[in-house]
């Protein structure tokens, strides 16, 4: 990130002596590089034979990240970075809305990248209270928010996500778009299938609970519960967990 500081007429003679450490700026602009996220203070000092003056400006340094919300593509989802783990978009947290292809751009911060609600692009089904997430632990240019990253977000050892669900080790689930890459008849389709299965289970249980209790719970707790069962079984067997079995569902 660069801050352009335009030279201003100071009223001081240009031939005046400069204090040690000051750089003369006569015409044009000077680039100030922002390397640190958060507030950065820049000071412009004018110094000449008649005296001097300084002005400071505080500039927030931040990076954006692009991403996509995918079960199928989910449009019009509320996308936000949950920094305090209350699973709501607070006024001080970055938020945006996914476009018709599930894509978004958002200001990066560590926390949980959350997608809430929206519409399934293919079926035009409303996904009220569907919450999927991606735990943010470092900036990258692109993030995928999927049912699989939702399970990984709640795992004690997220590095086990591929082996626990039988996903090929070559796939980075945090940046891989399952919809754009499906149709290979192999490892990509398997990932897409696992995501769909997780969503169907979580969304169905959420809707049953909300209808019975007249509540508006999200799928967050169901993804947490699935994660606990997946990790428990994977720890006991050291083999990938089949989430299609009756034993897992019950």
Predicted regions and their residues:
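Short edge beta-strand/loop segments characteristic of extracellular beta-sandwich folds
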Residues: 1-6, 66-70
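Short strand-edge motifs at loop-to-beta-strand transitions and within beta-strands
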Residues: 28-32, 104
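C-terminal edge beta-strand
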Residues: 53-61
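Feature for extracytoplasmic/surface-facing segments of secreted or surface-associated proteins
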Residues: 62-250
């Amino acid at each position: 990130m660069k801050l352009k500081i335009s030279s201003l007429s100071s009223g001081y003679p240009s031939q005046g002596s400069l204090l040690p450490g000051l750089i003369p700026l006569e015409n044009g602009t000077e680039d100030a590089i922002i390397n640190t996220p958060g507030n950065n203070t820049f000071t412009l000092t004018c110094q000449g034979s008649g005296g001097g003056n300084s002005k400071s400006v505080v500039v927030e340094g931040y990076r954006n990240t692009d991403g996509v919300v995918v079960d199928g593509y989910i449009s019009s989802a509320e996308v936000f970075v949950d920094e305090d783990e209350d699973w709501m978009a607070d006024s001080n947290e970055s938020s945006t809305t996914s476009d018709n292809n599930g894509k978004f751009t958002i200001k990066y911060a560590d926390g949980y990248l959350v997608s809430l609600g929206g519409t399934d692009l293919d079926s035009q089904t409303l996904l009220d209270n569907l919450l999927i997430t991606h735990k943010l632990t470092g900036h990258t240019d692109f993030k995928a928010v999927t049912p699989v990253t939702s399970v990984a977000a709640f795992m004690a050892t997220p590095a086990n996500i591929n082996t626990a669900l039988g996903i090929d080790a070559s796939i980075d689930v945090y940046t891989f778009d399952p919809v754009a890459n499906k149709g290979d008849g192999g490892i990509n389709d398997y990932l897409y299938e696992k995501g769909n299965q997780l969503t169907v289970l979580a969304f169905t249980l959420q809707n049953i609970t909300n209808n019975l209790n007249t509540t508006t719970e999200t799928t967050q707790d169901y993804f947490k519960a699935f994660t606990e069962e997946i990790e428990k079984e994977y720890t006991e067997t050291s083999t990938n967990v089949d989430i299609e079995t009756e034993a897992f569902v019950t």
